Design a protein with these regions (language model features):
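Residue positions that mark polypeptide boundaries
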Residues: 3-4, 171
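Flexible glycine/proline-rich, aromatic-decorated loop/lid segments
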Residues: 5-14
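Fold-independent oxyanion-binding glycine-rich loops
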Residues: 9, 21-24, 34, 50-52
Length: 180
């Protein structure tokens, strides 16, 4: 489906986005909350891709339970004390080598942590550049981030049969309930 590709590469084509595919209304509920958590931690859009069956048909489900004790992972956020310890704040510095950079909230520090940037044409310090080597470093970092994301998203349901073929099928309702 076009919406899957468009969601996965929604930008200039130089980044990927996280896609979650719920199998039923319960997972829609759970994945919607998890999408916000992942978006904060990974600093990238996360799309919950629901199909027509889930969205248009009536379903009998258990009552959705919200966990008021759930704590969200806001990701790598520097506070004023962290910034005071740094010589320079680099918005796109990959200090931990996982593709995810540290960020700040507006107003965190009177002198450090603010930045202005545009697109992917920037260096580690959010300064504009069209240098090809720096752009390659940025894209390499984004690939690392996507690999890190693969360790954080819900595990896929993979059903391999003895049949040979070359067809990938995405569908619902639940693949766990399918006889095929």
């Amino acid at each position: 489906e076009m919406c899957i590709r468009d969601s996965a590469y929604a930008s200039h084509g130089d980044t990927k986005h996280i896609l979650l595919f719920p199998e039923d209304p319960q997972e829609c509920f759970e994945f919607s909350a998890e999408a916000f958590n992942l978006a904060e931690r990974l600093q990238t859009p996360v799309f919950v891709i629901s199909d027509l069956d889930i969205g248009m048909n009536d379903w009998v489900t258990d009552k959705f339970e919200w966990d008021d004790e759930k704590k969200y992972d806001r990701g790598k956020v520097l506070n004023a004390e962290d910034l005071d310890k740094m010589d320079n704040f680099g918005r796109y510095l990959d200090i931990d080598d996982d593709g995810i950079c540290y960020r700040t909230y507006p107003g965190t520090h009177p002198e450090k942590g603010a930045f202005f940037t545009r697109g992917t044409s920037h260096d580690e310090y959010a300064r504009y550049t069209e240098n090809g080597d720096i752009n390659e470093q940025t894209l390499t970092r984004l690939v690392k981030k996507f690999r890190t994301a693969s360790e954080l998203v819900p595990n896929p349901i993979i059903d391999l049969s003895d049949k040979q073929g070359s067809c990938l099928l995405y569908t619902s309702p639940s693949p766990r309930d399918s006889d095929t």
